[in-house]
């Protein structure tokens, strides 16, 4: 098992776990309703050099040369720049949106998405991806990690608590309530 920075060649391997992680948000960020259009839009976003879902913000976990899981992380203070790229792409396709709702606070190294393909679940891959992201965040000088977990996902909430994340607020995002959780990494 290795964890590494994603590359453009990973585009086909990251789509399934990314869409699984985004769940109901997949249509909001893509501006699409049909599954094949959603997949095409996230492939397009992934191949960009900038943007929230650019390959530059992904780490992948490989098992036997297959992508077993992904984590998407970026600095929260960079999100306006990252989102402007995505918003321009959406506007080109007639989806007019000025901004996305805010899902984090200032000065956080934010875990946007985390998912493990079903064939690889139960092997501790999600934990390893999170630990890897925390290490990278610390190396880059960030002091705090953050993530959101849906209010109904008690199992995930419990796992994050065991990893040292603490709920500091609740955020309503597109009509759904999420726990905002943070962990100091300095």
Regions found by a protein language model. Name each.
Residues 75-109:
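Conserved acyl-donor/pantetheine-binding loop and adjacent beta-alpha core of acyl/acetyltransferases
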Residues 23-46, 57, 90-92:
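Conserved GNAT-fold acetyl-CoA-binding loop/helix
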Residues 47-60, 77-81, 110:
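A short helix-loop-beta-strand connector motif used in the catalytic cores of GNAT acetyltransferases and
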Residues 60, 66-75, 110, 115:
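Conserved beta-strand in the GNAT
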Residues 107-109, 121, 130, 137-148:
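Conserved GNAT acetyl-CoA-binding A-motif
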Residues 91, 107, 142-164, 170-186:
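C-terminal "cap" of GNAT-fold acetyltransferases
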Residues 2-16, 24-28:
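A short beta-loop-alpha structural element at the N-terminal edge
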Residues 62, 89-90, 94-96, 114-121, ...:
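A short, internal acetyl-CoA/4′-phosphopantetheine-binding micro-motif in the GNAT/acyltransferase core
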């Amino acid at each position: 098992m290795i964890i590494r920075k994603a590359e453009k060649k990973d585009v086909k391997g990251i789509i399934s776990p990314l869409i699984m992680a985004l769940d109901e948000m997949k249509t909001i960020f893509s501006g699409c309703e049909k599954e094949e259009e959603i997949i095409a839009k996230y492939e397009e976003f992934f191949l960009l050099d900038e943007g929230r879902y650019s390959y530059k913000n992904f780490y992948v976990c490989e098992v036997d040369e297959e992508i077993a899981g992904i984590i998407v992380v970026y600095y929260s203070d960079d999100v306006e720049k990252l989102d402007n790229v995505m918003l321009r792409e959406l506007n080109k396709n007639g989806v007019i949106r000025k901004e996305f709702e805010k899902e984090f606070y200032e000065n956080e190294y934010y875990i946007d998405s985390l998912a493990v393909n079903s064939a690889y679940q139960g092997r501790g891959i999600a934990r390893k991806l999170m630990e890897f992201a925390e290490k990278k965040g610390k190396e880059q000088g960030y002091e705090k990690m953050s993530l959101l977990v849906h209010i109904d996902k008690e199992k995930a909430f419990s796992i994050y608590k065991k990893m040292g994340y603490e709920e500091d607020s609740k955020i309503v995002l597109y009509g759904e309530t999420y726990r905002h959780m943070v962990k100091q990494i300095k």
